[in-house]
Amino acid sequence: MQISHIIKKYDEKTVVNDVSFSLPKGKVTSLIGPNGAGKSTVMSIISRLIAADNGSVVIENKDINKWNSKELSKHLAILTQTNNIQMKLTVEELVAFGRFPHSGGRLNSKDKEMIDKAIDYMELETFRERFIDELSGGQRQRAYIAMVIAQDTEYVLLDEPTNNLDIYHASNLMKIVRRLCDELGKTVILVLHEINYAAFYSDYICAFKDGKIASFGTVEEVITKENLSSIYNVEFEIMQIKGKPLSIYY
């Protein structure tokens, strides 16, 4: 995926300003930065939820705006910050939505196999017949990720997936993200506020400030005292824990 010179304005305010980068295939890339830095807007443009005013996003050598929605949904899946489905659905019914781009609502044996695999992968078998609104926050988030797995796309986009999760469920979710890449070969793009989750579980980090890319590279290249202090305007110290540069800020 290649993002080239994208610009987005709301009225007179430029929220994304000439952003360009490539997403490495089969890797986890996290978008980080302060509130209002433009990272979620970039994610929305990449997933075609909103249109850029200028620039392009290219997937498989084809501009994202030239894909029809059904075909694009076979290549790219997104889980947004708010996923409030206004229907009484079981876990299995929710996960089945992931097969809609493939089946058009008429599930065949291949679709059912993918649904079963996704439920099993996310360890949701005991919740299969439970209604979504009966689940805890962590269980519900796993169900939505199972839906994304069932969709079976190369690119998986997750916008602040750890929002509203406690430490236990958030860390478990990040382990799942890592498995999506390592075990299933997905290219995963996340928006994260928690810098240490980005540092520990990502392969690459794209850091934003004021609508522009402040730093892009491997975790070790981006997570430095100088970079983070400049981006967030607070003091940082970096410690190596299990071979990862984790940050302390104050």
Model-derived regions, located:
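Conserved ABC ATPase signature
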Residues: 131-135, 139
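Conserved ABC ATPase "signature" region
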Residues: 96, 109-127, 152
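Helix-to-loop junction immediately C-terminal to a conserved catalytic motif
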Residues: 47
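Conserved ABC transporter NBD signature motif
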Residues: 55-63, 72
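The feature captures the beta-strand-to-loop junction immediately N-terminal to the Walker
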Residues: 32-34
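Catalytic Walker B motif of ABC-type/P-loop ATPase nucleotide-binding domains
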Residues: 156-160
